[in-house]
Swiss-Prot record:
The active site is at 131 (for autocatalytic cleavage activity), 168 (for autocatalytic cleavage activity). It comes from the Bacteria. Keywords: Autocatalytic cleavage, DNA damage, DNA repair, DNA replication, DNA-binding, Hydrolase, Repressor, SOS response, Transcription, Transcription regulation. The record marks 96-97 as: Cleavage. PANTHER family: LEXA REPRESSOR (PTHR33516), LEXA REPRESSOR-RELATED (PTHR33516:SF2). This is LexA repressor. It catalyses: Hydrolysis of Ala-|-Gly bond in repressor LexA. It comes from Xylella fastidiosa (strain M12). The lineage of its organism: Bacteria, Pseudomonadati, Pseudomonadota, Gammaproteobacteria, Lysobacterales. The gene is lexA.
Length: 211
């Protein structure tokens, strides 16, 4: 059973609302957005979305709609998503603290509206630690990463030092490279000349999962 155009539109509305506000829209808000006279039509479409494995609903909660992992979503439905929606893989974890080893990935895909990021990211990483707290990046956030090996001093980057990955503020001077935390509880990282160092990408925005 495939989704109708209105069901695909409702799914996009739910996705964008959760990404923007951290919670799902209420059934009344969905009804208002689509011009329905009441919530009965919304309930029918939500029933279909739940049967198709797109969402699950938490009983007794007005904003209890939850998105399922998109690895469970029909590829045909994904192909019909708007060009304004990015389909981004979550590739693993990145340290906002001491650098951590590269992660093999979470086997997960997230749909996000393009407007949340600049430039457009190529993938997402889950933040571990709070060394970037004062930049508004917290433990558990998903950060968008634009894949590039070029960066300027003052940009927030995802960097690799030997086999470890971290997200920090890049500072380049004539004779040294430093990766600065945005939390006074953490010390800067001085990149030594004998270390294998590379910029893996630029930070370009974040998604804060509903906790």
């Amino acid at each position: 059973m495939s989704l109708s155009d209105i069901q695909q539109a409702i799914l996009s509305l739910i996705t964008n609302h959760i990404n923007a506000d951290g919670v799902s829209p209420s059934q009344t808000e969905i009804a208002r957005a689509f011009g329905f006279k009441g919530v009965r039509a919304v309930q029918h479409h939500l029933d279909v979305l739940e049967q198709q494995g797109m969402i699950r609903r938490v009983p007794g909660q007005a904003r209890g709609i939850r998105l399922k992992h998109l690895t469970q979503v029909d590829e045909a439905a994904l192909a019909l998503q708007s060009e304004d929606v990015l389909r981004l893989p979550v590739l693993g974890r990145v340290a906002a603290g001491q650098p951590i080893g590269a992660d093999i990935g979470e086997d997960r895909v997230v749909l996000l509206d393009r407007v949340f990021f600049s430039p457009a990211p190529d993938y997402l990483l889950r933040v571990q630690g709070d060394s970037m707290r004062d930049e508004g990046i917290f433990d558990g956030d998903l950060i968008g990463v634009h894949r590039t090996h070029d960066a300027h001093s003052g940009q927030i980057v995802v960097a690799r030092i030997d086999d470890e990955i971290t997200v920090k503020l890049l500072k380049i001077s004539k004779d040294r490279i430093r990766l600065l935390p945005r939390n006074p509880d953490f010390a800067p990282i001085e990149v030594r000349s004998d270390q294998d160092f590379a910029i893996e990408g630029l930070y370009c925005g974040l998604l804060r999962p509903n906790r």
